[in-house]
C-alpha cells in the first residue's frame, strides 16, 4: 500500500472512531482477500472498505468498488466471521475520498 492509501485509512479510522465506532482489526487478510477496517458499531460488526483517489478523472472513489471487489469483501467477511466464531449482525460500509476532500462515510454499500 502506498502512503496515500495509508493516510486515507488513517483518516477513515479517525472519522469512524469520532462517530463512536470501535476498532476491532485493521488490514485483516485471508486467502480470499483483505478487509481494510473491521469496526464495532453497537451490536453490529462493520466491515469497512477504504477508497481514495487522487482525482475524479476516472470516476469517484466509490465507483472503484466493483462487483468483483464486493464478492471478495463478502468472502473475506465470511471467513472472518467463521474463523472467529462470530454470530452477530454485520454490515458493509465504505469511507471514500477524492483528492484533498474530507472523507465520506457510506453505510450499507453492499447488501447481501
From Swiss-Prot:
Alphabetical list of CDD domains matching this protein: PoNe_Nuclease
Membrane spanning residue stretches: none
SUPFAM superfamilies: Restriction endonuclease-like (SSF52980)
Similarity-based family: Belongs to the UPF0102 family.
This protein's name: UPF0102 protein CV_0654
Entry's Gene Ontology molecular function annotations: nucleic acid binding
Pfam family, one: UPF0102
